[in-house]
Amino acid sequence: RICPRILMECKADSDCLAQCICQENGFCG
């Protein structure tokens, strides 16, 4: 999957860019 390396806070996968997923630490990855 393609995930830009940008530190983004999230609550759900939809908060993240591209194919990033929301990880347990509260950040996209």
Swiss-Prot record:
* Record site feature (Reactive bond), residues: R5, I6
Key words, A-Z: Disulfide bond, Knottin, Protease inhibitor, Secreted, Serine protease inhibitor
Q: Which family does it belong to?
A: Belongs to the protease inhibitor I7 (squash-type serine protease inhibitor) family.
User: What biological function has been recorded for the protein in this entry?
Assistant: Strongly inhibits trypsin, weakly inhibits chymotrypsin.
Pfam families on file: Squash
UniProt GO cellular component terms: extracellular region
Instruction: Give the residues annotated as coiled coil.
Output: none
Q: Which domain of life is it from?
A: Eukaryota
Q: What InterPro entries does the record tag this protein with? A: Prot_inh_squash (IPR000737), Proteinase_amylase_inhib_sf (IPR011052)
Domain comment from the record reads as follows: The presence of a 'disulfide through disulfide knot' structurally defines this protein as a knottin.
GO molecular function, one example? serine-type endopeptidase inhibitor activity
Q: Which cysteines are joined by disulfide bonds?
A: C3-C20, C10-C22, C16-C28
> Mind telling me what this protein is named?
Trypsin inhibitor 4
UniProt-annotated location(s): Secreted
